[in-house]
Amino acid sequence: MVHHFEPRPIPGDVLDRILESALHAPSGGFSQGLALIVLDDPDQLAWFWKTTGGNDFGDPPPVIVLPIPDKRAYLERYSQPDKGGPDGPFAVESGWPVPYWDLDAAMACMVMLLKAVDEGVGAWFFGIFEGQAEVLETLGVPDGLRPIGVLAFGYKAPGDRMEGSSVTIPRRTFGHLVHRGHWRTD
């Protein structure tokens, strides 16, 4: 992930290809319950950073994207006859053992992160830990919806390098990741 960005803008066609890639991410029942709010105006970006506690991570990106899943699209889709109908288990939120609206939004984020790399654009995913209510209200996000995080896009600044836990904590081994046939504790 890139934390230090050049100030130069991303050409519109490049940014559009990154954003469009989200349309090709998995979508449970083809519910397509995802919206992307794109902020690329310098004044809007300055407001975002001020509202959310600043950009003390490095040089700010020229574009941020808020991926906002909409569970209502999933509940509506899964109340259709081919998905169990209005009385089926997935027609209500409590019927979902995992909130697929968030999962699908996360997969769309991963697709956009990978497309950014393909386009030569640096990227980073982070969370909003301060000011989220004000961000949602100011951007006109409907009640009950919230972003799963924020994607930052821009060209990597010279000298950007991994810092913090990415450098100090060793990556887990393949053997600790993969459990074949059953859960291992060793």
Per-segment meaning from a language model:
Residues 17, 21-28:
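N-terminal structural module
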Residues 56-67, 139-163:
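A glycine-rich helix N-cap at a beta->alpha junction
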